[in-house]
Amino acid sequence: MRGFGKYLLWVYAGMALTFLMIPIVYTIIFSFNDSRRTNIIWRGFTFDNWTSVCDAQDVCPAFMNSLIVAGVSTVLATAMGTAIAIALVRYRFKFRQATTLLLFLPMATPEVVLGAGLAAQFLQLGVNKGLGTIIIAHTMFCISFVVVTVRARVAVLDPALEEAGRDLYGSPNQVFWRVTFPLLVPGIVAAALLSFALSFDDFIITNFNAGAAVTFPRFVYTAAARGIPAEANVIASAVFFLAIALVLATQIRGAIKRQQLAKAG
């Protein structure tokens, strides 16, 4: 009976993984399809879509807009979120719990509510919508995810390490940059990658606050009615391969570091 349950668990895990991978595999395969539009009809294998990825109108500009928005909002959200996370863990101040609750609210609020609320604010303030308003909106909701991720890292740091730095007559700045910050780097990197992914593929909040600006998700959505260009599959596949490469590089780096620590020990 126990063996049968283990078998069912593996079957369930395989089905879940297959369900998750089907859209990705479809996108990769049909990025090589000899067709100018995405469809389920295989017309032959070709590299033309990969060698002429910017030939389709508006694909590359939309992709670059997404990279700019995701990059800038990630830097802003990571910087502010890291500072907030350290303050919430290390310092006691009035309304600390209320601040924590407010920071978690964007994570629990539906994106359509956040998007509509921000759009109304920009309208009231007379702000012209564009890449700037998208960056503001993305930074706002990404900060919460950064705080949660970095806060977990700060909470497990050994205070004795910082005390040792102070005992060696290190100034507060020296202790932070030479002791605390290096220990926080894994959490900060994880938070930055999460923020970039959330910003890059966001559609709902972006659609409310983009104005005439077109990001890659907006381009795919509007192009779906007339047929998504095959070049969009190429870009999506390239982003997926890049994400896999980053994960593998992180795992390899971690394995090498563990081996070095084991040898040193």
Where are these regions (language model features)?
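Transmembrane-helix boundary motif in ABC transporter permease subunits
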Residues: M1-Y7, G71-L103, A116, A120, ...
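Interhelical loop and adjacent transmembrane-helix boundary motif
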Residues: R2-G5, S35, W50-D58, F200-R253
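Hydrophobic positions within alpha-helical transmembrane segments of bacterial inner-membrane proteins
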Residues: I22-I24, A70-I86, V112, A116, ...
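Short hydrophobic faces within alpha-helices
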Residues: F63, L88, L105, A160-L168, ...
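Transmembrane alpha-helices
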Residues: Y12, L17-I24, T139-M140, V147-R151, ...
